[in-house]
């Protein structure tokens, strides 16, 4: 489904501010796989997502999505087949448009449908009802008036409406309060499972990284230093994961946000 081969990205090359953000990273993702990605700040997690989406072009290497080499394909073209949620709930939807208009835009996936049929509107309401937030009764409400959790749940729905080939979740619950974050995370696992989506999820919650999906990778210095799945992953604890990081990278993970990040009652043992 997704094959990344030896990609490199250097920012400000040849200057005092030179930063090797991606350091020969390779990754193969199978169809329908749900991978959680962890790592300290500056490890290259969001940079990897930006490379996949085409926010910038990599300096070297290739990115192949569903058999098509997209390494040099512009970002707006890739956006038609890649869904992405950001940490900021304000991104991913149009605040000046109402809920229905945002859904119409998402359903068009790059094309504007000026009029929605009664059947389409009914379908939108049915999908919104699944979120359990009462948004199905607020179709004409401006998105800018929604709470952060409501807006992130709506954005999740919008990003998956057209069944993207790849779904990227960039700490999409980090800015929400614990209760809302738990609800959005539960919705995420349900939608990914029901739609059989291929998904990469960045998280700073190490327990979530082990509980959700079927594979966990850890990044450091712009590369993958640890990759676990199957029985090995099932047996891992957070402490064991930290030990494996130290063994793989040769250094201690010193990041308060990761070490202290816990969300109670995280949905466990999510499988496709």
Positions of the model-derived regions?
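ABC ATPase nucleotide-binding domains
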Residues: 234-272
